[in-house]
């Protein structure tokens, strides 16, 4: 089915373009949401009359979207979740979780605007795109952590794959092993024993 796009649709086309889409996509998504018209001769003439009004509305919507984008561009959102020692979450962080964090900060975002291919299932800092308008897209970072302290460590860029206590213990064990297996220290001890035997 051929349709005339009334606004920019991602991965499909720009406003005013005539594109061929599957019937179900047109009937269930594009036409009911007012994103397109069937590409008949009457609708083509209707679009030409509506073109100036549609472009003016698009410019207004884009200006509002730019204001929202300036508020959230580069923002870091912290989501606390339970996770295993290896950093795998017991569950996942979904679009709904991200939206609730922005709503708590006073920014309204629709589910369809968050471009998340798959749920986040690991601890760390993840970059996520948000399309506040078909022509305006921003990137935000989502920090997933077990606690607020761990979130701060992640944001500072520290490695959280092991606990700090474990890292300190490993460093001490390595230093002790270095002293124990130091070949020069071992030879000095043998020379002292040989001198004592004589």
From Swiss-Prot:
Domain of life: Bacteria
Signal peptide (from-to): none
GO biological process: translation
Ranges of compositional bias, category Basic and acidic residues: 156-166
GO cellular component terms attached to this protein's record: ribonucleoprotein complex; ribosome
Family note: Belongs to the bacterial ribosomal protein bL9 family.
Function: Binds to the 23S rRNA.
Name this protein carries in UniProt: Large ribosomal subunit protein bL9
Species annotation: Rhodopseudomonas palustris (strain BisB18)
UniProt gene name: rplI
